[in-house]
Amino acid sequence: MSALDGVFGRYTEEDKRRALSILEQTGLRDFLYHRAGELSGGQRQRVGIVRALMQEPSLLLCDEPIASLDPASAQVVMELICEVSAKRNIACIVNLHQIEAALKYMGRIIGMYGGRIVYDGPTSGLTEAMIEKIYNKPMSQLMIGGEAIA
């Protein structure tokens, strides 16, 4: 299918079947006939993931997927990203500024400061000193779970 076909709504039956299948897998089938403006921020993020999955990617780039989402919606989106990665064997690069989410959902963290990598390793190896280096702030000024860490 070309981009022009998509603009004019000329989708094949196979495209429609795949879209419905992915919508069901992501828990969005009930919103099939809703306009985008009627969806919550978390639902919109999930729709974005569905749209990406329709392209059958080998890599999924997620730039701040939970920014501006409430905690419950953020959890749903992060769980979906992890599920998509595991079930479809798709590598996911997720850019997050929420330390708590990175620690909870990611197996590997690449922390950068000033355009340079200051940490690249497993989540379990990330120390408070490394977090301070990544954010260039003492732990007492950083928040996790709505509370200062230190």
Task: Indicate residue ranges for each PLM-predicted region.
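Conserved catalytic motifs of ABC-family nucleotide-binding domains
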Residues: 56
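Helix N-cap at the start of a conserved alpha-helix in ABC-type nucleotide-binding domains
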Residues: 71-73
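Catalytic Walker B motif of ABC-type/P-loop ATPase nucleotide-binding domains
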Residues: 60-63
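Conserved ABC ATPase "signature" region
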Residues: 10-31
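Conserved ABC ATPase signature
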Residues: 35-39, 43
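H-loop/switch region of ABC-family ATPase nucleotide-binding domains
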Residues: 96-97
